[in-house]
């Protein structure tokens, strides 16, 4: 009886042990091959499963159709390292495809994993930050800011982080872009990307920061870039600056 009880206890502990594995451990355990995982998309994220991923917007009286959808990510793994990331929104996995399906994972876990994947760098095909930006219930702009400011991170990844930071909602994201653009010790290309991202903020939200760059940044190339994007904004504050300069 004691032996039977012991065996039952051992087997009852197995699922808990398997469940204790982190998402990176589950992916690395494959060794080599294709991994599929699925997680909830944040509100407003839509897609057709392949050709289109978009974030819909509306106004006070109209809202574009966008049913809650899931993000599906295929990872190509070789010798326990991810070599390719393919992201989809909507659709479904084709049956019969040779892949290890991890099923549905927590969006917060997925976002953290893809941020760490981007931070690792290396020769990865695809954009690991894209699925992180799509994940539901995840605030990733602090991680994007950290990536953008870390010299050890590959330049291409840092520029991509700034791009996605520019797409993030909220005043905190705009302030982060402002701080990157004004960081005289930062990489010029990353700072120029921050200036561009500021110009893309909705409602001319980035105009005050662009005005500061154009007026007082010590780098003439950044001032020139800020002036260019201010010229595209058609904002009265930008026109006032041009009048001030030309006077």
Can you name each region flagged by the protein language model?
Residues 1-4:
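Positively charged n-region of N-terminal signal peptides that target proteins for export
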Residues 6-15:
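Bacterial N-terminal signal peptides
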Residues 18-20:
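Boundary at the C-terminal end of the N-terminal hydrophobic targeting segment
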Residues 22-117:
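N-terminal accessory interaction module
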Residues 107-118, 137-149, 170-182, 203-215, ...:
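Amphipathic alpha-helical scaffolding segments comprising HEAT/armadillo-like alpha-solenoid repeats
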Residues 122-123, 153-156, 186-189, 204, ...:
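Alpha-helix N-cap/helix-start positions at coil->helix boundaries
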Residues 132-136, 165, 169, 198, ...:
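Alpha-solenoid repeat junctions
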């Amino acid at each position: 009886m004691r032996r039977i009880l012991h065996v039952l206890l051992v087997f009852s502990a197995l699922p808990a042990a398997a469940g204790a594995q982190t998402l990176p451990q589950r992916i690395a355990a494959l060794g080599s091959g294709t991994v599929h995982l699925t997680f909830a998309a944040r509100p407003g994220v839509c897609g057709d499963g392949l050709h289109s991923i978009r974030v819909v917007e509306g106004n006070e009286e109209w809202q574009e159709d966008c049913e809650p959808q899931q993000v599906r990510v295929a990872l190509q793994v070789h010798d326990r390292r991810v070599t390719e990331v393919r992201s989809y929104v909507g659709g479904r996995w084709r049956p019969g495809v040779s892949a290890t399906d991890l099923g549905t994972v927590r969006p917060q876990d997925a976002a953290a994993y893809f941020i760490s994947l981007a931070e690792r760098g290396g020769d990865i095909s695809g954009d690991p930050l894209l699925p992180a930006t799509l994940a539901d219930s995840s605030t990733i702009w602090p991680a994007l800011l950290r990536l953008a400011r870390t010299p050890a991170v590959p330049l291409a990844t840092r520029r991509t982080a700034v791009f996605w930071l520019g797409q993030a909602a909220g005043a905190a994201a705009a302030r982060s872009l402002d701080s990157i653009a004004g960081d005289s010790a930062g990489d010029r290309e990353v700072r120029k990307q921050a200036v561009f991202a500021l110009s893309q903020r909705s409602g001319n939200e980035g105009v005050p920061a662009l005005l500061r760059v154009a007026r007082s940044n010590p780098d003439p190339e950044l001032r020139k870039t800020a002036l260019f994007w201010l010229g595209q904004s058609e904002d009265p504050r930008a026109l006032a600056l041009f009048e001030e300069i030309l006077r």
